[in-house]
């Protein structure tokens, strides 16, 4: 357990591994066991969707060829219902048509082939999560900027000229004299 207060600790990114082969899921778990991720897994697209209802992951790592629902069908549904979940395909079937469909229909972050290189898989996951973190931070900062602009607009409306700055020829900021302090002429 960490000594840092709970509100300071970063939450571990949640990765959902979807593959109909237990051996593949197990190998991915072994590959990622020392990484700072919370892992969950599903043996089918339907099981993955059910898990997402109660505990949506940050990243979905899915196979393509699975019974009942293909990885591409799963990706399309996730894109529709959970657009903020990052999507990576890891499959042995890397035909151009499948790759194009995954990119266009599922908006995948990466398309990786089996057998995978552990370093490449870890890097793809890291980059995807970093992209997500940056996107979320940018959205937060944009919202903060909009809120600040609204405050300035309200201040300017209530106190015209409050946001204007006058400078002299040297560039120094001029501070207007308080009208009450000026002598009567």
Where are these regions (language model features)?
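Two-component/phosphorelay signaling modules centered on CheY-like receiver
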Residues: 7, 14, 22-40
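C-terminal output helix
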Residues: 116-125, 129, 133
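Active-site residues of response regulator receiver
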Residues: 19, 63, 91
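Receiver (REC) domain active-site loop signature in two-component systems and cognate sites
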Residues: 66
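Helix N-cap/capping motif at the beta->alpha junctions
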Residues: 41-50, 71
